[in-house]
Amino acid sequence: MGSKGLKGVMVCLLILGLVLEQVQVEGKSCCRTTLGRNCYNLCRSRGAQKLCSTVCRCKLTSGLSCPKGFPKLALESNSDEPDTIEYCNLGCRSSVCDYMVNAAADDEEMKLYVENCGDACVNFCNGDAGLTSLDA
């Protein structure tokens, strides 16, 4: 992967961080800041709750509200999670995948980016995200 592809992957990861900030999923973790929430969500794609909460300075809670000083709670159980996932996919594809398509050098590379980026958005929004390369 050339520097153009690496730059695209870096931008993709940054935009996914923004998506994480906007799309909340049901959970029982509370974080002090949005950065902590993003850290926790990204960590949870591979790590355990307790480890991620410690590393990202978040707290695990069994209730629907967060302790004082930890305002960043994921959506409560009455949320419309399917709508959230649908909007996550739409936002991910329109921002991240559009950027990747515009960065493609030719039609073949563009098709590869569209296919892999769409799959990555589905996995990301459904909570199955892993850090993988787009040139698989």
Curated annotation (Swiss-Prot):
What are the subcellular locations of this protein? Secreted
Transmembrane spans: none
Q: Which InterPro entries match?
A: Thionin, Thionin-like_sf
**How far does the signal peptide extend, from start to end residue?**
1-27
Q: Which domain of life is it from?
A: Eukaryota
Which residues belong to the propeptide? Answer: 73-136
The protein's job, in short, is:
Thionins are small plant proteins which are toxic to animal cells. They seem to exert their toxic effect at the level of the cell membrane. Their precise function is not known.
Per its UniProt record, what PANTHER family does this chain match?
A: ALPHA-2-PUROTHIONIN, THIONIN-2.1-RELATED
- The answer, when asked if Secreted is one of the entry's keywords, is yes
Lineage per the UniProt record:
Eukaryota, Viridiplantae, Streptophyta, Embryophyta, Tracheophyta
**Disulfide cysteine pairs (residue numbers):** 30-66, 31-58, 39-56, 43-52
Gene Ontology cellular component terms for the protein in this record: extracellular region
Q: Which Pfam family, any one of them, does this sequence belong to? A: Thionin
The cross-references to SUPFAM superfamilies, in alphabetical order and at most eight, read: Crambin-like (SSF57429)
| GO MF terms, alphabetically ordered | toxin activity
This chain is encoded by the gene named THI1.2
PROSITE patterns attached to this UniProt entry? THIONIN
Q: Which GO terms describe its biological process?
A: defense response
Q: What name appears for this protein in its UniProt entry? A: Alpha-2-purothionin
State the family named in the UniProt similarity comment for this chain.
Belongs to the plant thionin (TC 1.C.44) family. 4 C-C subfamily.
Q: What is its main location?
A: secreted
The UniProt keywords, alphabetically, are: Disulfide bond, Plant defense, Secreted, Signal, Toxin
Species of the source: Triticum aestivum
